[in-house]
Regions:
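Glycine-aromatic-enriched surface loops/turns that form tight recognition elements
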Residues: 2-5, 19-101, 105-178
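Sec-dependent N-terminal signal peptides
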Residues: 6-11
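N-terminal signal peptide c-region/cleavage motif recognized by signal peptidases
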Residues: 14-18
Length: 178
């Protein structure tokens, strides 16, 4: 009986930890990427009024339907795969455009909402964004040592910028300059 109770408690703890929701601290931290600066387009894109950039509302592998992202997000095993994915996406003319690209690290950081974590992004603007790293097109020049070239990433768990080995699974969100 005691073994069953302990097993049940451990299972419930694990389930509750995996279902942790996003936390935002707008009462103590000013919004860095407020929802009112973004214009949500019916075609599944988001126009950033501050930067002029147009973002895909959904990450690669998902599609935009009825104001949300559906499907299964696909992570990329390598930076080179993420960079080459651009040609595939542009061939599909997503939202009617053929000029999608991986954002640079500063562009991707511009949509981080530092008042939130788990993920550090406004989910009312960018639905279904996981708390995970996302590729940029920016190499990490400080870490080039003759081997694999690491890329700069933004980890949307807390909105941190870092570098990653090109073999780590990471997500992709495309951007374009209208």
């Amino acid at each position: 009986m005691k073994k069953t109770i302990v097993s049940t408690a451990l299972l419930l703890t694990a389930l509750s930890a995996s279902a942790v929701a996003q936390t935002c601290k707008y009462d103590s931290i000013m919004a860095t990427a407020p929802a009112d600066r973004f214009i949500i387009q019916e075609k599944g894109t988001i126009l950033d009024a501050n930067t002029g950039l147009e973002w895909m509302a959904c990450i690669y592998g998902m599609s935009y339907e009825n104001g949300t992202c559906v499907g299964t997000a696909q992570d990329m095993d390598s930076w080179s795969d993420a960079l080459m994915l651009r040609d595939e996406v542009n061939g599909e003319e997503v939202a009617g455009y053929t000029d999608w690209r991986l954002p640079n690290v500063k562009e991707l950081a511009s949509i981080v909402e530092y008042a939130c974590f788990g993920p550090a992004i406004d989910l009312s603007v960018f639905p279904e964004t996981p708390s995970a790293p996302f590729w940029t097109n920016t190499p990490d020049a400080d870490e080039i040592n003759g081997g694999e070239i690491p890329a700069r990433i933004i980890d949307f768990t807390y909105g941190t910028e870092d570098f990653t080995s090109t073999g780590e699974k990471t997500y992709v969100r495309f951007v374009r300059t209208p």
